């Protein structure tokens, strides 16, 4: 009898323990579910779409980068993450410029670019040596520098953004396209200024059609070129199509065979992109890349046209922080003074 009573006590104890465990799990699960529900309810605000913008900051023209960033940040309410790319010896200066100026509120990451990846891929001779600067080729290596984003915007440093960058980010890329660019034949006003300053806007202006490797591509020399100073890129497609490796292949072929020259279209970075992306890119709204402002200090766009433009690009020799240049007032309104006093404007001869 005593044994039976003891067994019943043990069973009762086990039953109580089991009930306690079940009750604990239910309460704990309810708490976790509630937290999950809270997280889900907060997701739309907390996980607002992040727009990655990649821009380079070269030592001698860092003021250009900061002006571009200022113009982007000031003209949008979107959640922008700036990837500011520089060489190792400039990284500290980049951070100080941002953190000790009006740009301190921006969301940014500083990325180091190792120029050793370019070894053996660039011809040393050039009529425009500034185009051989390592950072000019950062756009070739976007997936190696930026990892967690599906879609990325790349901008040259000599641009000013007057529109909401979210509009550019919303550019539709066709299925199978790794990037979107702006065609060089896409605006009547652009064509007018092309004639005025003698610019090339076809493949003939960038590639040496006397060379067999170029002829074998089967690309008509009259094909309209595009400008890779503004890029909307799909990182998944870029990696899937091995775009970086294709670009490197043509860089190496150029070293061996001199297939394109900076003396043609001034495009040592543009030319391989024209080859690799021929017939396989989407287009950007022309107003999001109004360019050639730096080609001729005597060639000007109309004020009305400039006001309509979403993005201005001073590609060419005549930069808006230097003399001579055109429409530099539009650029200077976004200039962020260098806290270190190194970068200075030069608007007088």
Swiss-Prot record:
Keywords: Glycoprotein, Glycosyltransferase, Membrane, Signal-anchor, Transferase, Transmembrane, Transmembrane helix. The chain crosses the membrane at residues 7-24. Residues 25-349 are lumenal. Residues 1-6 are cytoplasmic. It is an enzyme of class 2 (transferase). Glycans are attached at residue 234. One of its GO terms (cellular component) is Golgi apparatus. Its EC number is 2.4.1.-. SUPFAM superfamilies: Nucleotide-diphospho-sugar transferases. This is Glycosyltransferase 8 domain-containing protein 2. It comes from Macaca fascicularis (Crab-eating macaque). The lineage of its organism: Eukaryota, Metazoa, Chordata, Craniata, Vertebrata.
């Amino acid at each position: 009898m005593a044994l039976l009573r003891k067994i019943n006590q043990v069973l009762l104890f086990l039953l109580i323990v089991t009930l306690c465990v079940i009750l604990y799990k239910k309460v704990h699960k309810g708490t976790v579910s509630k937290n999950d529900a809270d997280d889900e309810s907060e997701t739309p605000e907390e996980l607002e779409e992040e727009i990655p913008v990649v821009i380079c900051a070269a030592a001698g023209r860092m003021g250009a980068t900061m002006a571009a960033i200022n113009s982007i940040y000031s003209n949008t309410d979107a959640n922008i993450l700036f990837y500011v790319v520089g060489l190792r010896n400039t990284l500290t200066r980049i951070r100080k410029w941002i953190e000790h100026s009006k740009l301190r509120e921006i969301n940014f990451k500083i990325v180091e670019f190792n120029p050793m990846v370019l070894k053996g891929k660039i011809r040393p001779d050039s009529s425009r040596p500034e185009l051989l600067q390592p950072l000019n080729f950062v756009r070739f290596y976007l997936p190696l520098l930026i990892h967690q984003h599906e879609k990325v915007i790349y901008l040259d440093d000599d641009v000013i953004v007057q529109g909401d960058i979210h509009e550019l980010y919303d550019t539709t890329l066709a299925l199978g396209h790794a990037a979107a660019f702006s065609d060089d034949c896409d605006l009547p006003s652009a064509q007018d200024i092309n004639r005025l300053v003698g610019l090339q806007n076809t493949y003939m202006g960038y590639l040496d059609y006397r060379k067999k490797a170029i002829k074998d591509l089967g690309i008509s020399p009259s094909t309209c070129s595009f400008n890779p100073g503004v890029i909307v890129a799909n990182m998944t497609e870029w990696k899937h199509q091995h775009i970086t490796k294709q670009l490197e292949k043509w860089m190496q072929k150029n070293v061996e065979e001199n297939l394109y020259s900076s003396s043609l279209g001034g495009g040592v970075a543009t030319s391989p992109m024209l080859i690799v992306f021929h017939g396989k890119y989407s287009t950007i709204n022309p107003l999001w890349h109004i360019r050639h402002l730096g080609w001729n200090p005597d060639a000007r766009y109309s004020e009305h046209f400039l006001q309509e433009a979403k993005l201005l690009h001073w590609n060419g020799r005549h930069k808006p922080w230097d003399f001579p240049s055109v429409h530099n007032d539009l650029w200077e309104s976004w200039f962020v003074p260098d806290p270190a006093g190194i970068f200075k404007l030069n608007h007088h001869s």
